[in-house]
């Protein structure tokens, strides 16, 4: 009986200690749950949230699994549970309850100084190198002066300082936002999320893929936003790609720019007319037609008139018609009336040939059959006028304008008299060099001179032409 009180005492002590342990474990589990809840409701980045949860398990007990890892901002692989002293120090800085990002950075800097971890690619982002310091100054300036465009501004800072460490992903974007002051941190993070969502599922043009290789999706998005790759420009680009095949991107760019100006300058009626007239032909036909039909009243009237006259005869007929009509005021009225009378019932081509004086003896005899000697003399006189042309007109112009009449010779002569010194004085050096290169294959010094002169006056637009005859055709259009 004497041992019974002792047994009861031991049993009560055992039960009390067991209950105390159970209560203690329940308290720790409750505290662990509260700690994890605090981590979940805070606006931490994914890696900081994992660090916070990991600290909860260390402080209040729990499993140690790969679920709770610390990911360094710059590490390519996550750090598992085993932490070095430097990483442990840094982890405590990040899981600090104060929530101050600036204080966390100061804490991490002290960790780096204390443990001297030189292998970490991490946080001392405020690095010892001058380049890094300049980048940080640039970044801080972005945050102060360009809060709405700070991502784009930071990209420029990175480019200027050669900052090329990894893709500029959402995590990096979010991390940059952590240093934002004056309550705009959440707005900055929202922009990061929006940047990421906007990019999802959107096709990226090959040009932007190549340009942003290794740069991440924000670079691609900015490239796509600033490119000319909308629906209309893609259509133009396909046409220009075909027209500029083998001539490089500069040709395409100029082609697209010229097309854009054509679209803005041309009347809808003229545009439809050119599309109809050039149906089934190359895009160059439509572009030339649009250029011919200037957006002034006279140009439209001439174009519509020539369209009627040249129905079924193609674009070359209309081009010649417009050229002749434009030079009608300079032609001898007597010749014009004679040609109209002589070619009555024979169509526009006959009248055109007559106005240009491109007939030989046999042609004159045929055209003037039954119309008297005056007709034949007038026809022959026009024929001789081309042969007895002004001696001041170069042989090169006579050769180019053979069969084209006096209007062509006069324009060619004017082009020859262009003062190269005055022309080159106002010409961009790149355009001048380009024109010299483009006209290098033109035979003859005078021909090359005219080619360069026309090219420079056209500000290099002559790049789409390849022969001297096309150069002069462009000259005649002036």
From Swiss-Prot:
Any one GO CC term of the record: extracellular region
Domain of life: Eukaryota
Signal peptide range in chain numbering: 1-20
Tissue-specific expression: Expressed in seeds (at protein level). Expressed in flowers but not in leaves, stem or roots.
Compartments, as annotated in UniProt: Secreted
Pfam families xrefs: Vicilin_N
Broad class of the protein's primary localization: secreted
GO BP annotations, alphabetical order: defense response to fungus; killing of cells of another organism
UniProt KW Disulfide bond keyword: yes
Disulfide bonds: 435-455, 439-451
Record keywords: Antimicrobial, Disulfide bond, Fungicide, Plant defense, Secreted, Signal
Domain comment (free text): The presence of two CXXXC motifs with connectivity I-IV, II-III structurally identifies this peptide as an alpha-hairpinin.
Annotated function: The mature peptide has antifungal activity against germinated and ungerminated spores of A.alternata (IC(50)=7.4 uM and IC(50)=12.5 uM, respectively), A.niger (IC(50)=2.8 uM and IC(50)=4.0 uM, respectively), B.cinerea (IC(50)=9.3 uM and IC(50)=16.2 uM, respectively), F.oxysporum (IC(50)=8.0 uM and IC(50)=5.4 uM, respectively) and F.solani (IC(50)=8.0 uM and IC(50)=7.2 uM, respectively). Has no activity against B.sorokiniana, P.infestans and P.ultimum. Has no antibacterial activity towards C.michiganensis, E.carotovora, E.coli and P.syringae at concentrations up to 40 uM.
Miscellaneous information on this protein: Eleven additional peptides containing a similar cysteine pattern are predicted from this sequence. However, there is only tentative evidence.
Name the record gives this protein: Antimicrobial peptide X precursor
Species: Stellaria media
Taxonomic classification: Eukaryota, Viridiplantae, Streptophyta, Embryophyta, Tracheophyta
Gene name of this polypeptide: sm-amp-x
